């Protein structure tokens, strides 16, 4: 075993593994190089990835470094700005780029040429004057249209940016940050462990089998769900997450923050927070706490739920004037109104009005919000995706209402809006709500499954379960019941053996399918084992439990058990309080880890959204118990 010298800015995941495999390894700070007897070591690791910037070796140390290279001893450099005669004039930001194992001259055990690795929000030294004939081990590529493997020789990939490569016979160069691969949650974990094991073996000059650190996110893969009450632990963890992750603003008095974005720093694993306050997230989060109060009598949960409901209607709704009833999108987007976001914000209010004795203090406010949305709803019952107040002139408003102007047939934009019209009608709202909702869902279902799609075909199906359940509940029409079963049965085609639902998009027609530089689907190719807990699977616990309440068909109870079981098994368990109890957007159901195509501008696989994901899942996990208690 080689004796290894480590120069770095303190401990890291990689330095800890080096110390583990080599008990004589020693760690020094870069600035302490003068006290080191370099000749006393057999191998050297220069780790700059945990520093603020790419490391530039001081000239005296650089001279020593180049002399060491001449000895033939193994040297590994990580995020060092200049090596040999190569220097990096540009440090590239890597956000939507992933790495491909090229498999040319240097074999990494456990990897196959074309395997894909995600180094998250990274930095990469782009060295000038590298030979075009360089056969890099790992190369960075932008927007790879594949889940976890691709053809490395595909012409469209191009040469890529070298990320791991050999300089001469004895210097292994990592252009990127990778020393904190574990705390930065590089994925897939198995692929990265192969790479790290290769680096360790290179320095040790013999094969090694390190004990890798515990993953920051673990899962209870073998948890069993036999009854609705078996979700209690997951619900407790999920509700507690809002507190420990500091998402509630003044206990909900001023809303809830949007969540955690996908951007995880490769330097130290810090995950970026999204601090916008969204009305929909606030309403959905309030719904999760409301259901806890209804189930357990927890007065603290009731207080938070009331705070969030008050916030939505007291601060985020126009109370008078030309736009009376309008519910704002966010604390920043004061004049933008999305009907789908409004629908989800008022969902807890309408459930409370329908299924509790005391009802909701804000039922009329919710009705006003829906009345405002009707003003730009066409004769077919559908709306344009959003309303921008500065552009909504009386002329444009009339055009929407009279001619189906710019409407969309996406369930993503319209189905929950129609469901809320139905719930409001059921609780005493105007008959017009029923008429518009029936027309809207009929328009969509007459086109289904060829209606427009947002992220995937799977999402459109998941989005329809709750609205079609409410539609059948209100009308009792056999045709509407058949629609519900049709969509539910279609969903079975994309259900994974674990109970989750794979993303699927026949013909890749969705607006966000294979997109770049915007909102993007997690799906690369149909058949990828990826579940989307932001746009698809997250809607199903509430949808299936409502369908069971309406039909009393054990089929829907079983579908709820399957998806709820999947969700308690893929909930994050972590020593990090900002992660423990959360669900992330993307989940690979074969690898059983958070992973997927990271092309979305901010809401890629590792993101955690307070409303769409956390609030909706927690409501859905609890609602079945309320159904059993005959709400």
What residue ranges belong to the model's regions?
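Solvent-exposed loop and edge beta-strand segments that line ligand/cofactor-binding
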Residues: 265-282, 327-345, 352, 396-414, ...
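Extracellular ligand-binding/catalytic regions of CAZymes and related secreted enzymes
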Residues: 146-236
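An acidic, glycine-rich "communication" segment
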Residues: 76-149
